[in-house]
Amino acid sequence: MPFLPVTPEELQGQPDFIIVTGDAYVDHPSFGTAIISRVLEAEGFSVAILPQPEYRSCEAFKKFGKPRLAFLVNSGNIDSMVAHYTVAKKRRNDDYYSPGGKAGYRPDRAVIVYCNRIREAYGDIPIIIGGVEASTRRFAHYDYWTDSVRRSILVDSRADILTYGMGENILRRLAFLLDKGVPVRKIRDVRGTVFMESREFCPHFESAFIGEYDDLKTDKKEYAKAFRIQNENQDPFYGKALVEGYDNKILVQNPPMHPLTTEELDKVYALPYMRAYHPMYEKDGGIPAIQEVQFSITHNRGCFGNCNFCSIAFHQGRTVTSRSVESCLEEAKLLTKLPGFKGYIHDVGGPSANFRGNYCEKAKKAGVCKNKNCLTPSICKNMKVDHEEYLELLKKVEAIPGVKKVFVRSGLRYDYMLADKNDDFFRKIVKDHVSGQLKVAPEHCSNHVLKLMGKPSIETYDRFKAKFYKITEELGKEQYLVPYLMSSHPGSTLADAIELALYLKKNRINPEQVQDFYPTPGTASTCMFWTGLDPFTGETVFVPKDYEEKRQQRALLQWYKPDNHDTVRKALYRAGRQDLIGFGPDCLVKPRVLAKERSYGKKDTKKPQGKTLGKKPMKKKR
């Protein structure tokens, strides 16, 4: 099946939809634009792709003319501000979703810019926005880059409808209604959509009011309360419609669309993707983002792990849906026939690799629990901990002719692995699916910080680590755990960072990479960062915002690096922990080296001051 049209010459008449995206066009099921375009194509609609249009004028948006039904707009696979800036708010030099990996192809706040250009070009034409940027910014939200609470992206973009979550069934329904001639501003009963209405409007679903924007942007307690209400209503079984006030209008979020069934998910992944970037990018060096996913298989969606700093639950939901084993095997067979396949499946995973859709009977019938997490602070008694189906999947994939090795590179939820009384899966992972290093995410060692993160206790990680190395030794292999760690998360004090540094030293862990907490839209941790409150308990949370303290917390996680020693000393003095400065086995750094000691033994390269008296010394003849 060829790529979808990217030029007017490839079109046969007026397209039904034009998808405008901030990413380059990659026709692979790891890219939202590819999935939505193929789903609509399968329903009989014609779709044109407008990837990374020149945004400084509206001319590029006139390329295909008007779509018959609507423009569909997304920023790409990542929020455009996260794609463009580091946590230190420095501009990134690269962009793996753009030609040659170079930055500069999409604007900041891409969804808003694209929609405004479309309005400039065509005026009152239906515009539907979706994807991560739209989904996580659907309500009034804290924006880290301006350090303020911004309005819903639906308001600023002037789009007609916002779709949130995974969009296949939402777009199918919207496309059907638009095709039947229903005006876009009359579509008000589709799940998974957000829209603006007059104050007199009565939602089609039972609703809850979460606040006025003017209050939410100034009152942090009201903001935290609103976030809690949002969080409690993101399940399709019991979630209410949510209403937010904007001057003389209201924003209405209908309840979430139900997740795709296994059968529906199988059909989505069986669509005729080209599984490559468009050939027009070849001259620029291709699209680097394809490299990680080209020979990988996504077997699930959603995540009941529900870490507070992660937006997956707010976007994909806590309900896990998995593809059938047969569907994954068909994809694996297809991968073996692709150009460039060398026998290695790089991943069989998802948001959390070891979750399948058979985890909880209650969740299937009534939704996930409203005020309770599945895994933290301890695993729910209703949770069915079973890796048998995933184990079967891995075994069958590696048995396919042409497959030499199958790796699991997505994150594994280690507390869920430990809870499995059958060790077969654990041993299988260690024996066959680790490429020398297994990446896991303990994130911290301070249990009160881990609680605010929504992560399991450090004791749980220690038990996992001990079991991993025990099995590794029994198998006679040399493999290592690589822990992901985070500094400056809300709740993390300087004392907590020092505790983590001591934990790392004691366990002989020298992390090469650490992540400073990045407050991205749509997460509970970002709510804590802005308000200084835990939205679930109302309790005050310490937030490290001071630049110097954030720098010190980060340096403590890499205390062993000489470049960090001065910063670590300052942190220890600041915390009153001078006992950790010295030469003892428990010390983190040595005392400050005096300037004279630094230069001791070095050749003095300074030129003598003044003129040399007498004759210049004669050069020796060789």
Residue positions per predicted region:
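Radical SAM enzyme core and accessory elements
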Residues: 1-5, 217-257, 264, 270, ...
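N-terminal pre-triad scaffold of radical SAM enzymes
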Residues: 23-25, 284-311, 344
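Terminal amphipathic helices with adjacent charged low-complexity linkers/tails
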Residues: 56, 185-234, 248, 257-260, ...
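Conserved, mostly hydrophobic/aromatic
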Residues: 160, 268, 303, 307, ...
